């Protein structure tokens, strides 16, 4: 990617991030240059900014998880419009925790758990729970292997779905930065 190919709205966001990081006006140019270099090298803007809005919460995102997609917000909408007050919710393949955290936000009386095969993703999901002051249990599990509790009213699984042979067709910012284990299905 060339700097000329970075959209104007992304440049504006990078400038804001540089202002946030710079301790003084003399450090601003260095920070901005560093952020531009990262973006030119195809690092996702969401990773550079570190936090993204997701539905009604804020999420920290980095290389430990897949960046939540608009389709995930659509899934939240479907659940919100069609499910009435589940008691126990399980999110399988939780990643950043976005689905589990939104379930707790939408259904505050529900017991919500999120599991993921990645220890790093679980760590990030716990950070996001703390960031949003939401009481959700997260633990490591390959699918349902370590899930001892039964009787969930709602089980959500937004699992990897891209066939191995199609991975090379993904954009560089996806294939070079996001965890392949969250994509390869």
For each predicted feature, which ranges?
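Conserved AdoMet
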Residues: 13-80
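Conserved SAM/SAH cofactor-binding pocket of Class I
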Residues: 74-169
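A general structural signal for well-ordered alpha-helical segments in protein cores
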Residues: 11, 32, 42-45, 96, ...
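Phosphate/oxyanion-binding loops and surfaces in catalytic or ligand/nucleic-acid-binding neighborhoods
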Residues: 21, 38-42, 132, 162, ...
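Short, solvent-exposed loop/helix junctions and linker helices
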Residues: 4, 66-69, 89
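Non-catalytic nucleic-acid substrate-recognition regions in nucleic-acid-modifying enzymes
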Residues: 1-11
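Mobile active-site "lid"/loop adjacent to the S-adenosyl-L-methionine
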Residues: 159-185
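Conserved beta-strand segments that form the floor/walls of ligand-binding pockets within enzyme
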Residues: 60, 102, 116, 175, ...
